[in-house]
Amino acid sequence: DAYRQYGINCIENGSYDDAVDAFQKALDQSVGSVGAEELDICYYKAKAQYLSGDVDGAIDTYTAIIDYNKDSDAYYLRGCIYFAKNDSDKGLKDFKTALSENDDNYELYLGIYETLSKYGMNDQGKEYLDKALKLKAKTADDYMQRGRIYTMLGDYDSAIKSLQKAIDEKLVKANYYMGEVYQKKGDNDSSQKYFKKYLDSGEADSYDLMNMGQAQMDNGNYDTAITYFQNALELESVPNKQQITKAMIIAYEYSGDFATAKSKMEEYMKDYPDDEDAAREYQFLETR
């Protein structure tokens, strides 16, 4: 467990090779037994391999999981990597298999849509969203996921109706997605109201807070964005620490606080010396 936690910390700090080593050591300690914890470590190892640039290694790790239990998540994640390698045929095949193993999982349909959309296959991606909407909603989470799908399809009225059902059933996370809908509708006051409800719940993770901060950046509310980014960095687990720190520096820069932006960038460069874009940005800040 110590190696697993160390590996997670390494991912958060951008030390991906060290993370892979830590996860491998954790697996070596399992002495042949494979349970839920070992599979969890394998997923982390594959993520670290991909982030380190070892794409083929990540594919091998996901394949090992698939060989063991044909897990739909492993098929989906391997499919995403195939798309990153420009092998859409293998990617689509994995997506199809993932759904055959788990065809009532809304998040799987959403993930497939987002991947296809990212690689210029938006129309094909929408077909998956349409398939998901044919499922029958049974739980508050189902209504929330349907709300997300309607939002992606631009049907904001239907999104609000679905999300309201989830909120009525006390699903706190639905407030976050409701905030996103109003953000897209251009109603910043309503958006902020729902984001605040979610923030006050204490359930927001670092990815949610980063997205809320980015939404404020898009509206030119840089001070509010900085607050969201700071809240994210104060959490116990921050897997996307590098991205949040970088976004916060940009927010300081856009707000006109170049001194703080420069100071934060100096700290960032010590933590992430291999970021060439940041090095160029630092040169710019030195001229301000």
Name each model feature, range by range.
Residues 5, 37-40, 44, 51, ...:
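Canonical tetratricopeptide repeat
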Residues 29, 33, 67-68, 101, ...:
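Structural marker of alpha-solenoid helical repeat scaffolds
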Residues 12, 51, 84-85, 118-119, ...:
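Register position in tetratricopeptide repeats
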Residues 1, 35-40, 73, 107, ...:
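Start-of-helix register in tetratricopeptide repeats
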